[in-house]
Amino acid sequence: MRHYEIVFMVHPDQSEQVSGMIQRYTDLINAAEGKIHRLEDWGRRQLAYPINKLHKAHYVLMNIEAPQVVIDELETAFRYNDVVIRNMIMRTKDAVTEASPMAAAKEERRDDRREVKKDVAAAPVEAKEDSVEEKSEEAASEE
């Protein structure tokens, strides 16, 4: 079996159908003894240029190992599904399992947001402690 990288873009109005589509495609691959090495749902993203007067699309990336029969079925499924506005199937030499640059960047942003939230949550507590100390010093000096 050969290794493939598949990217398909779904019409942005049909984003809620993406999970069902992914499930159908994974079932198709698994039924033919194929393996899914990486599956990433990138979500709605801005297109580089308009396609069919659309400026956004829902992206999905899959790295799979499957026989040619499955690839042919996926190609026909993409072709006859009006919701899929673009797709690309590329053969690769090896299985790719590490996170893509898109997913890695998304994970970094998520981690950065968590750190900022922790810093913001900790800052008011420190400020309150400082103001309590200042008030107690003022009260001590008045006495």
Swiss-Prot record:
- What family does the entry list? Belongs to the bacterial ribosomal protein bS6 family.
What is the source species? Colwellia psychrerythraea (strain 34H / ATCC BAA-681)
Which PANTHER family did the record assign? MITOCHONDRIAL 28S RIBOSOMAL PROTEIN S6, SMALL RIBOSOMAL SUBUNIT PROTEIN BS6M
Q: Which PROSITE patterns match?
A: RIBOSOMAL_S6
| Record bears the keyword Membrane | no
This chain's function reads:
Binds together with bS18 to 16S ribosomal RNA.
Q: Where is this region: Disordered?
A: 96-143
Where is there biased composition of kind Basic and acidic residues? Answer: 105-143
One Gene Ontology term, aspect cellular component? cytosolic small ribosomal subunit
- The identity of this protein, by name, is Small ribosomal subunit protein bS6
